[in-house]
């Protein structure tokens, strides 16, 4: 399945440095200038997965294929974007197309990199961006909801669901709260909220960009952001974009030593990628064989035919059953033959809800 995270933030907070490190390219021009990233830069990065390495080793696979997540480096936002100031209109259009927002916040001092607001205050920065998104949503809903209410009063069932859930979102926005706090009462309202593509309904991951010295522990600024995230149902990670950019240029064998010297167990990018994956409500299942072992992505709660469809639409259309082994059983039993002998291979039908880590073989007929 396709899923995209938009990297956003005020100018000069480290967005493009972070994106460059993510994709190990210099595709985005990381310069000390507010609008150095005018066109969105898109990069697909592998989701780090030690489980896949173990599965491939047991299956003696010739190739490993990780699942991927797409990051979009979106042009810097400034105050007034909801009215089209700066690159506001372009920013809002680009962010509307992503599934989740990765909001980079400056949590480091340093006079050599200018701040567009002339101060370092990540909470204020977060509120500046959130306010612009809320104003854009507010403008949209104040025009849409009255029309939906009229249609609902005339007996339009679809409009009734939309009017209910979007009316709730509008009330939240008027209280300066994001639309992601909206609580749809049923699946129909949930679909209506998703169709509305509200900017503040998208899940948010705050990335606290800190100095090298704070990369392992964070600092007072990143702690304040973490507290904010917890209060509003968002997530946060601490990262040093400058360090990650340096790590990205190192040979694999030198990276672990570099991380050890910094007191880090894994790169900040890996933590960020996993956090984004979880934020989108995604899980991983696997296929394994001599030719390749591969990680696949589905939404949490997906049933077996939907997972089969990620491989090929024919698999979903002609789904018969899914021969399934839990990851721990696959490793413990040394692969599919051992799991079968131990009674750990299950034959699951169309109502089976896929579990994170399942190793699956789909049987189908078209």
Task: Name each region found by the language model.
Residues 2-8, 13, 19, 147-355, ...:
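C-terminal-of-GTPase-core extension/linker across diverse P-loop GTPases
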Residues 1-114, 123, 142-143:
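Conserved G1/Walker A P-loop phosphate-binding module
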Residues 92, 131, 135, 142, ...:
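Short amphipathic alpha-helical segments with heptad-repeat character
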Residues 37, 86, 90, 133, ...:
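Alpha-helical initiation/capping and key positions within long helical/coiled-coil segments
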Residues 43-48, 75-85, 96-158, 174-186, ...:
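Conserved Switch II/interswitch segment of TRAFAC-class P-loop GTPases
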């Amino acid at each position: 399945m396709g899923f995209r995270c938009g990297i956003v933030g005020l100018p000069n907070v480290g967005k493009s440095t972070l994106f460059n490190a993510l994709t190990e390219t210099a595709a985005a021009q990381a310069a000390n200038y507010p609008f150095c990233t005018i066109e969105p830069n898109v990069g697909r990065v592998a989701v780090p997965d030690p489980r896949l390495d173990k599965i491939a080793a047991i299956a003696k696979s010739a190739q490993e294929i990780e699942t991927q997540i797409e990051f979009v480096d979106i042009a810097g936002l400034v105050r007034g974007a909801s009215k089209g100031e700066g690159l506001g209109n372009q920013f809002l259009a680009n962010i509307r197309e992503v599934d989740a927002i990765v909001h980079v916040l400056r949590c480091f001092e340093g006079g050599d990199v200018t701040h567009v607001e002339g101060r370092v205050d990540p909470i204020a920065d977060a509120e500046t961006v959130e306010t612009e998104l809320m104003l854009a949503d507010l403008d949209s809903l104040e025009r849409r909801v009255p029309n939906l209410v009229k249609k609902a009063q005339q007996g339009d069932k679809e409009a009734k669901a939309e009017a209910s859930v979007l009316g709730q979102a509008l009330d939240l926005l008027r209280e300066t709260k994001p639309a992601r706090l909206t609580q749809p009462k049923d699946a129909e309202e949930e679909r209506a909220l998703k169709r509305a593509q509200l900017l503040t309904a998208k899940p948010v991951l705050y990335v606290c960009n800190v100095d090298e010295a704070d990369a392992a522990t964070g600092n007072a600024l990143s702690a304040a952001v973490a507290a904010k995230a917890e209060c509003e149902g968002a997530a946060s990670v601490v990262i040093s974009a400058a360090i990650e950019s340096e790590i990205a240029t190192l040979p694999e064998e030198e990276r672990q030593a570099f991380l050890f010297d910094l007191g880090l167990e894994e790169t900040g990018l890996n933590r960020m990628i996993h956090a984004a994956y979880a934020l989108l409500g995604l899980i991983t299942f696997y296929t394994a064989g001599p030719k390749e072992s591969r990680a696949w992505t589905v939404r949490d709660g997906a049933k077996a035919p939907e997972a089969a469809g990620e491989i090929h639409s024919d698999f979903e259309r002609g789904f018969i059953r899914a021969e399934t082994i839990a990851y721990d059983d696959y490793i413990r039993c040394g692969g599919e033959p051992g799991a079968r002998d131990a009674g750990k291979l299950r034959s699951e039908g169309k109502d089976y809800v896929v579990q994170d880590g399942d190793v699956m073989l789909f049987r189908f007929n078209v």
